[in-house]
């Protein structure tokens, strides 16, 4: 990728990540507003989950179109690691060196923006990823959850149904399920940029725990998922035929 194209890709990543953190962080408030409008009782958690999953589906569909329109922009750094390990893409080191910081900066902007824009009655719904256990347990949880969701996303996108609506519903349901599974451990994030944005807001972005739990282990989980997907689900590359003498 030429330098100009790489810079444009990094700028697109920053914009998309900003918008993703801004919108995704508002899902809790949006769910509360919708359930309140529908008159759903506060204890009916399954209805709230249905609303959240539906809203997330709309968000994923919208961002899929947006990322495509911007030439393949991404709002999650682990996408590159998973795609590389799966043999689906091979980004240059220069590209990664520009796009990772751009995504982190976009996430910081998104987290700061939603913190300012969120109405007072919904401020309590703003809860970014936070470590609720010891660092080693949190790192293991974040790595395992990232592995699970990455493998699921790869399968749905590459091998899953061709119907866009069904594909989006599978993705949103999987994401919500994994978030529920990791809620008592790390938040969870499964997106280092998103975690960094909220860590910056809460002033613990420059700690070892943040790097260890929300960057190193998710990358390990994503790369392992990509490698397993490549071995299990993708056909091996054809061997070149040798000419007989």
Swiss-Prot record:
InterPro entries: Aquaporin-like (IPR023271), MIP (IPR000425), SIP1-1/2-like (IPR044222). One of its GO terms (cellular component) is membrane. A motif (NPA 1) lies at residues 76-78. Its main location: membrane. It comes from the Eukaryota. Keywords: Membrane, Repeat, Transmembrane, Transmembrane helix, Transport. It is found in: Membrane. The chain crosses the membrane at residues 14-34, 55-75, 100-120, 138-158, 164-184, 213-233. Coiled coil: none annotated. A motif (NPA 2) lies at residues 191-193. It is a multi-pass membrane protein. GO terms for molecular function: water channel activity. Pfam families: MIP. Belongs to the MIP/aquaporin (TC 1.A.8) family. SIP (TC 1.A.8.10) subfamily. Aquaporins facilitate the transport of water and small neutral solutes across cell membranes. Aquaporins contain two tandem repeats each containing three membrane-spanning domains and a pore-forming loop with the signature motif Asn-Pro-Ala (NPA). PANTHER family: AQUAPORIN SIP1-1. This is Aquaporin SIP1-1.
């Amino acid at each position: 990728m030429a330098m100009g194209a790489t810079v444009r890709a990094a700028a697109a990543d920053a914009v998309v990540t900003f918008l993703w953190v801004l919108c995704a962080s508002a899902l809790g408030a949006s769910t509360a507003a919708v359930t309140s409008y529908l008159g759903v009782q506060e204890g009916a958690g399954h209805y709230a989950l249905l609303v959240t999953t539906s809203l997330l589906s709309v968000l994923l569909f919208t961002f899929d179109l947006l990322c495509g329109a911007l030439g393949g922009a991404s709002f999650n750094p682990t996408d590159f690691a998973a795609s590389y390990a799966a043999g689906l893409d091979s980004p240059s080191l220069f590209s990664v060196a520009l796009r990772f910081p751009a995504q982190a900066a976009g996430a910081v902007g998104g987290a700061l923006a939603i913190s300012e824009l969120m109405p007072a009655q919904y401020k309590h719904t703003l809860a970014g990823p936070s470590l609720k256990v010891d660092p080693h347990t949190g790192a293991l949880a974040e790595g395992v959850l990232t592995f699970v969701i990455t493998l699921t996303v790869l399968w749905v996108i590459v091998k899953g149904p061709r119907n866009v609506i069904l594909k989006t519903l599978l993705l949103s349901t999987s994401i919500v399920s994994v978030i529920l599974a990791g809620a008592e451990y790390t938040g969870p994030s499964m997106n280092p940029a998103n975690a960094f944005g909220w860590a910056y807001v809460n002033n613990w972005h420059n700690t070892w725990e943040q790097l260890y739990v929300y960057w190193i282990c998710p990358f390990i989980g994503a790369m392992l998922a990509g490698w397993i997907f490549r071995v299990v689900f993708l056909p091996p590359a054809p061997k070149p035929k040798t000419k007989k003498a």
